[in-house]
Amino acid sequence: MTTRLGSVLHVPEYNTLEEIDAARQALEASLDGYAAPAAFGLGVATRGPSGDILDVWYPQPNLDAHRFVASALAHATGHRSGTSTAPLDTAQLDAVVETLAPAEACTTMAHPNLAAARLIRRMVDAPPPRGGERVVVAAFIGSLDDDPIDAIDAYLRLHLLSTRLVAPHGVSVQGIFGKLTNVVWTNHGPFEVGGFELARGQLRADGLDVVVNGVDKFPRMTDYVIPSGVRIADASRVRMGAHLAEGTTVMHEGYCNFNAGTLG
């Protein structure tokens, strides 16, 4: 039986690609002024005590794909067009999962975004990161030519590069340094520079060893993305946002910056 909740069409399950596309069209039609983004993602951010976003992990970045997922996120967050970011509370995240879940009945395609949303939902209930609080976020990039608007947006662009969805210079990173915060990168996650010595002392008082991998605006790529078919002798030599084609080897004295790399 088909039911309608608010302005969103709901059915028990979508068994075919055609049914998923019909649900997508109905959802998009319910969003006044909606325009599908060029790229989008649902992620988990670490927000420091000052309110700065220290990092964001996107388990499933998307480029020109999964429009049903994009419209579900837009419905939950209020996004309609252009480039924007938004936090999601638990109710909003649950609504996204509820909207996407009927598509799981279609076995002719994978559902990586639904799996990612469920994983993120589990993370919401996990102990908070040592360096701040965990925040669920969504990012929409209207055009790859749009410049980054904040750290949440910037991290989606870095993920697009490191997951090989875009090649170097395939998405604007103009002004990205100004959108990111200088961060202490440790084996216990990211920390704000200010107040880190006290945080380190508290960790040691808990009997934990603290390893600082760097103090920079960009983390190591391998802490967020591991591309297939590559070898990296020293993870600290490859910045998040690097693009490493399959077959690439980065030796100990090699280095790869963000928005750079190999094409195969």
Please name every model-derived segment.
Residues 1-223:
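Terminal amphipathic alpha-helical/low-complexity segments used for targeting or macromolecular assembly
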Residues 225-264:
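Structural signal for interior beta-strand "rungs" in well-ordered beta-sheet cores
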